[in-house]
Design a protein with these regions (language model features):
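N-terminal, active-site-proximal structural segment of metallo-dependent hydrolase catalytic domains
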Residues: 1-50, 63-71, 276-292
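Active-site beta-strand/loop signature of hydrolases that rely on acidic residues for catalysis
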Residues: 2-8, 18, 22-41, 96, ...
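Catalytic metal-binding/acid-base residues of hydrolase active sites
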Residues: 9, 36, 78, 111-113, ...
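Conserved beta strand-loop-helix elements of the APE1-like EEP
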Residues: 66-81, 201-205, 228-248, 272-273
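Metal-dependent phosphoesterases centered on the DNase I-like endonuclease/exonuclease/phosphatase
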Residues: 127-233, 237, 286-289
Length: 292
């Protein structure tokens, strides 16, 4: 089972090439971020033509609140949309239950807002995701998307969050307080805790970092690049977290998508080999945004 998560940057002219590149990977499930209203129908139709006949979207929800971008999930197997999470912008997390041949599982597609524009809304989004998913689930789960975090990771496995600053001697310390553009102020401790709660804390609830499970910390993959002051700095902002029962076999980034100018993000791709067929579970569902 092949899952690809990708921030497509709301592109319109590049969409045919984005779709072509994605379909060459032959995914079973696709989770897209930054899909806009003018492209969602084209995305759904194109994915359906390649066998991903079941889809759900949050663009309609975004537009209802005067916002532009949302999420799209497309699947080879039937899906049922789950209730919205309690986050500041509901369209930023789209959740479905997938009726796959080897058993049902949940897929949660997230796009955590960046801090430059949205400030503490980013932290509240992390907190909302953790509150929803920090529980023992009756079915396996996958959480994927663009999290705009962390700042960096170190070879020893330690994480540097955006709630920390790196001193000249290399030490990462939590900063004191910060006010965003809206004038909202809070502590670095809260920020640091919120990022860690999802990026590492959900492993306690069977949502394990698939990339690190497959590659360890000797490999430093990147999915987004900052360029300025004569240098380029890569960040691993896009992630897939998954239940152990789904048995991740490989997980890698696809930097050629970025190199070819298709988006400012590289997709992350994971292949799973679930060993045992399971019973399709029961879930509460809203049915909104579902299409077959």
């Amino acid at each position: 089972m092949r899952v690809i998560s990708w921030n497509v940057q709301g592109r319109m002219k590049a969409l045919p090439e984005q779709l072509k590149a994605l379909m060459q990977r032959q995914p079973d499930l696709v989770a897209l971020q930054e899909v806009q209203g003018r492209t969602v129908a084209q995305w759904r139709a194109g994915l359906q033509q390649h066998g991903l006949a079941f889809s759900a979207e949050s663009i309609t929800c975004a537009q209802a609140h005067g916002r532009t971008y949302g999420l799209l999930i497309a699947s080879r197997w039937p899906i049922t949309q789950l209730p919205w999470m309690d986050v500041p912008y509901q369209e930023r997390v789209l959740s479905v239950q997938v009726a796959a041949p080897r058993g049902s599982f949940e897929l949660h597609n997230a796009h955590v807002p960046n801090s430059d524009k949205y400030g503490w809304i980013k932290v509240e989004t992390f907190e909302g995701i953790y509150q929803q998913l920090a529980c023992i689930s009756a079915v396996p789960r996958i959480l994927c998307g663009d999290f705009n975090s962390p700042h960096s990771e170190r070879p020893d496995g330690s994480l540097v969050t955006l709630g920390q600053e790196v001193r000249a001697d290399g030490r990462a310390v939590v900063w004191d307080t910060w006010a965003d553009k809206a004038g909202r102020s809070d502590t670095g401790m809260r920020w640091d805790r919120a990022e860690r709660s999802v990026l590492t804390g959900l492993a306690a609830y069977d949502l394990v970092d698939a990339y690190r499970a497959c590659n360890g910390y000797a490999v430093q993959g990147c999915s987004w690049w900052w360029m300025g002051q004569g240098k380029t700095v890569g960040r691993r902002f896009d992630h897939i977290f998954a239940a152990r029962a789904l048995n991740v076999a490989t997980c890698d980034y696809l930097p050629v998508f970025h190199a070819n100018g298709l988006s400012d993000h590289a997709p992350i791709e994971a292949c799973f080999e679930p060993a045992v067929e399971g019973r399709i579970g029961h879930c509460r569902c809203s049915g909104a945004g579902i299409r077959q």
